[in-house]
Amino acid sequence: MSANSMSDPRSPNKVLRYKPPPSECNPALDDPTPDYMNLLGMIFSMCGLMLKLKWCAWVAVYCSFISFANSRSSEDTKQMMSSFMLSISAVVMSYLQNPQPMTPPW
């Protein structure tokens, strides 16, 4: 073991520990896309439920998927799962009330 320490050219007094930069100097860490998509998903879910618009319910599912895909693992998953379940329930309720195929909005 002492032979290893004798042949090691690194000096232990020059070792510097890594310190991550603060989040305010790196704007890439504060990406607002998941939050915006979560909010849009909830808005479209409510429009799909209240106005019985199937395309709004499908857009809500799409926004929920984008929000889930762009979120960090450290974020709260309860809000994301509630948004996802709200969008799924909007699709289910809109098709239970009117089982006809969706007509394009244009």
UniProtKB/Swiss-Prot annotation:
Subunit structure: Component of the PAT complex, composed of WDR83OS/Asterix and CCDC47. The PAT complex is part of the multi-pass translocon (MPT) complex, composed of three subcomplexes, the GEL complex (composed of RAB5IF/OPTI and TMCO1), the BOS complex (composed of NCLN/Nicalin, NOMO1 and TMEM147) and the PAT complex (composed of WDR83OS/Asterix and CCDC47). The MPT complex associates with the SEC61 complex.
Gene Ontology annotations for the cellular component aspect, listed alphabetically: endoplasmic reticulum membrane; multi-pass translocon complex
BP terms from Gene Ontology: multi-pass transmembrane protein insertion into ER membrane; protein insertion into ER membrane
Membrane-spanning parts: 33-51, 53-70, 75-95
Modified residues (N-acetylserine): 2
Organism: Sus scrofa (Pig)
Gene that this sequence comes from: WDR83OS
Cytoplasmic compartment segments: 2-32, 71-74
A GO term for molecular function: protein folding chaperone
Family membership: Belongs to the Asterix family.
Protein name as it appears in the record: PAT complex subunit Asterix
Region of interest (Disordered), residue spans: 1-29
Its membrane topology: Multi-pass membrane protein
Superkingdom of origin: Eukaryota
Spans within the Lumenal topological domain: 52, 96-106
Function: Component of the multi-pass translocon (MPT) complex that mediates insertion of multi-pass membrane proteins into the lipid bilayer of membranes. The MPT complex takes over after the SEC61 complex: following membrane insertion of the first few transmembrane segments of proteins by the SEC61 complex, the MPT complex occludes the lateral gate of the SEC61 complex to promote insertion of subsequent transmembrane regions.
Subcellular location: Endoplasmic reticulum membrane
UniProt biased composition (Polar residues): 1-10
Keywords linked to the UniProt accession: Acetylation, Chaperone, Endoplasmic reticulum, Membrane, Transmembrane, Transmembrane helix
One Pfam family it belongs to: ASTER
Lineage start: Eukaryota, Metazoa, Chordata, Craniata, Vertebrata
Disulfide bonds: none
InterPro entries: ASTER (IPR005351)
